[in-house]
């Protein structure tokens, strides 16, 4: 049995049977079923929280983590990893029509001269999203500072990375949903273990949460390698926890599936990529290590699941231009 599946199914049932309904303020004509808040957790030592009652988008979670850690805000970095679930929000940010969005993607994909002969970085910018805040929040590298502080002062109560920068919200293609995470260390003999707690203001439970928990469980494992400490728990403090009306049928199908049919999986990361930082944990070496990471360095081992459940991901409704 994959432990996370039973927990996930229980919350999904709570939303479906006990949630309140209302019109989504950000998506015209869309209704939500919602509960105010819940906590989710997993223990990485037991297994990686990859949902088995539907096939999960593992590549998407890892690509997003690599992207955020790199500090890039260029959507082409995600495209290079085969990930496109940020496309609609990026297009809305620039007020591109669907046709304009697809033309830019196809132009990049085919490497036409007009797309590579000049600096087009602003065209492909996603604004000051998570990755910018993590690595360059008003000139501060929050992610490196977190890792450095974990190593030097693990009992600090300020081991926090915050993506919610009010001054930058209008400059983001999407305000951060999971807006901060904190590391809580405790001594174990002559070393330490830690919990990673992330906070989320708005939670698409069907599509978003399975990716979010894999994202943070993978981040916790990266932190384990960099610090030498073991992660005890990954905990999500989730608010405005909802499913959309277009997800109801697939949610019902998932709830009908047996969460005990498949066993646990585990995440394996190529530790050799971190050698330079482990020898000398400087900011320069941190950047070098992060920039070396690729999808091929992360492997999900022993994963089996029910078939995929397809549903459209809804983006914000905004007026667009061609």
Residue spans for each PLM region:
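Terminal, non-catalytic protein-protein interaction segments that mediate quaternary/complex assembly
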Residues: 1-322
């Amino acid at each position: 049995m994959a432990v996370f599946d039973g927990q996930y199914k229980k919350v999904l049932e709570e939303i479906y049977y006990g949630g309140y309904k209302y019109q989504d303020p950000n998506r015209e004509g869309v209704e939500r079923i919602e509960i105010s808040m819940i906590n989710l957790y997993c223990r990485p030592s037991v297994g990686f929280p990859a949902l088995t009652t539907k096939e999960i988008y593992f590549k998407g979670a890892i690509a997003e983590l690599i992207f955020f850690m790199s500090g890039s805000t260029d959507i082409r970095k995600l495209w290079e990893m085969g990930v496109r679930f940020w496309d609609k929000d990026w297009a809305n940010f620039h007020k591109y029509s669907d046709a304009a969005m697809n033309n830019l993607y196809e132009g990049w994909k085919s490497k036409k001269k007009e797309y590579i002969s000049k600096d087009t970085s602003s065209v492909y910018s996603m604004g000051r999203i998570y990755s910018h805040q993590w690595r360059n929040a008003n000139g501060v590298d929050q992610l490196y500072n977190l890792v450095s502080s974990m190593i030097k002062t693990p009992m600090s109560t300020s081991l926090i990375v915050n993506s919610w920068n009010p001054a930058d919200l209008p400059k983001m293609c999407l305000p951060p949903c999971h807006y901060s995470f904190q590391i809580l260390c405790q001594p174990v003999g002559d070393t330490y273990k830690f919990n990673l707690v992330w906070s989320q203001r708005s939670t698409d439970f069907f599509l978003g949460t399975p990716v979010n928990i894999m994202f943070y469980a993978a981040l916790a494992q990266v932190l384990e390698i960099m610090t030498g400490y073991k992660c005890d728990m990954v905990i999500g403090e989730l608010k405005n926890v909802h499913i959309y009306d277009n997800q109801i049928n697939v949610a019902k199908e998932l709830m009908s599936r047996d969460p005990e049919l498949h066993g646990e999986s585990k995440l394996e990361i190529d530790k050799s990529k971190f050698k330079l930082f482990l020898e000398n944990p400087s900011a320069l070496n941190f950047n070098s290590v992060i920039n070396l990471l690729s999808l091929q360095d992360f492997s999900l081992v022993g994963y089996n699941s029910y078939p995929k459940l397809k549903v459209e991901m809804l983006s914000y409704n905004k007026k667009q231009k061609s």
